[in-house]
Amino acid sequence: MSNQRKRSNDEREEEDDEDAEGIGEWERAYVDDRSWEELQEDESGLLRPIDNSAIYHAQYRRRLRMLSAAAAGTRIQKGLIRYLYIVIDFSRAAAEMDFRPSRMAIMAKHVEAFIREFFDQNPLSQIGLVSIKNGVAHTLTDLGGSPETHIKALMGKLEALGDSSLQNALELVHEHLNQVPSYGHREVLILYSALCTCDPGDIMETIQKCKKSKLRCSVIGLSAEMFICKHLCQETGGLYSVAVDEVHLKDLLLEHAPPPPAIAEFAIANLIKMGFPQRAAEGSMAICSCHKEVKIGAGYMCPRCKARVCDLPTECTICGLTLVSSPHLARSYHHLFPIAPFDEVPALSSLNDNRRKLGKSCFGCQQSLIGAGNKPVPCVTCRKCKHYFCLDCDIYIHESLHNCPGCESIHRPKSVSLMEE
């Protein structure tokens, strides 16, 4: 009997081992739940759940400090008019499931978020999409300023097939970007899944061609570091990085949303002719010059040739005039004069006196900065006006508002000050 029990126990252990080997690493994470990884020890030795908002804010501030350090010292001229092609590797390597549920799904998800963020920060810029399948590069969308058009085209072509060809992708985007105006900054962002590239010719010649045409090529890898990708970025002045997980991939993508420093040849001041079209009347009917279709209502009319276009910003296909709106120029202005990062306030009891002088609440949203047990809540302070802000307002000010409410409240009209005197 004892021998039979031992045999049955051994058989059960072997079955458990086989079941564990049959599931993937990411599936095992769901099975085991790993709930202990979501706990952390506080200053009193007690276990409590991890504060995801604090982690997000720490990541945000690291990115902010990095951008601020790059712009420290002399003021750097930024390329506000950008022409960016996003190249997405949809070869068979994109079907790998080390990123759950697959590399292809994760790339599509974060490229969608990146497109929206890109147009929010760069309203005067344009994006185009290129995919790589079966060793061939395909143009999903031409350069344009409509995020919905790009996202719709991307989500309709999700399929991982064949090998990847980096050279074919570079040749295609070089052909497209070689036609953009000289004042625009030509950029390529490649999301590469494969560990090799199957090219029809010498890719080194293609890289030199991109370098001569002033294409700034950046690569984000999803597998491992490749020499050819690193060489491409070094030659063209781009950035090369490899994502280790989904969160890291998102951070790497968002680093490309703010405009990069302008190339010295393009930093020379010159005038750019632009048109500010009027929105067409709701009931009017006209042929759209960009889609070659009859459309009723929505659209804009070129002030020079009276052609109809759908979205702004864009270039008139009839007369070649750059068409923008005044809010686009206003939203691009903050990149030239970015607001300095706020200083973090350490949570010490000695700071309570200073907080009482300037108030116990956030200057932005009026939320209390004194938590339970009369403990100070983590906050930041502006270097100029010395007002305190909560973490949420800190993110909102630097990502959306681009002005410090405390500093803006100090400046008063001269007429008011003269009346008081």
Curated annotation (Swiss-Prot):
It comes from the Eukaryota. A zinc finger (RING-type) spans 362-408. One of its GO terms (cellular component) is transcription factor TFIIH holo complex. Pfam families: C1_4, Ssl1. Transmembrane segments: none annotated. InterPro entries: C1-like_sf, Ssl1-like, TFIIH_C1-like_dom, TFIIH_SSL1/p44, VWF_A, vWFA_dom_sf, Znf_C2H2_type, Znf_RING. Its main location: nucleus. Residues 83-272 form the VWFA domain. It is found in: Nucleus. GO terms for molecular function: zinc ion binding. Residues 1-26 are annotated as: Disordered. GO terms for biological process: DNA-templated transcription; nucleotide-excision repair; regulation of transcription by RNA polymerase II. Residues 11-24 have a biased composition (Acidic residues). Keywords: DNA damage, DNA repair, Metal-binding, Nucleus, Transcription, Transcription regulation, Zinc, Zinc-finger. Component of the general transcription and DNA repair factor IIH (TFIIH) core complex, which is involved in general and transcription-coupled nucleotide excision repair (NER) of damaged DNA and, when complexed to CAK, in RNA transcription by RNA polymerase II. In NER, TFIIH acts by opening DNA around the lesion to allow the excision of the damaged oligonucleotide and its replacement by a new DNA fragment. In transcription, TFIIH has an essential role in transcription initiation. Component of the 7-subunit TFIIH core complex composed of XPB, XPD, TFB1/GTF2H1, GTF2H2/P44, TFB4/GTF2H3, TFB2/GTF2H4 and TFB5/GTF2H5, which is active in NER. The core complex associates with the 3-subunit CDK-activating kinase (CAK) module composed of CYCH1/cyclin H1, CDKD and MAT1/At4g30820 to form the 10-subunit holoenzyme (holo-TFIIH) active in transcription. Interacts with XPD. Belongs to the GTF2H2 family. This is General transcription factor IIH subunit 2. It comes from Arabidopsis thaliana (Mouse-ear cress).
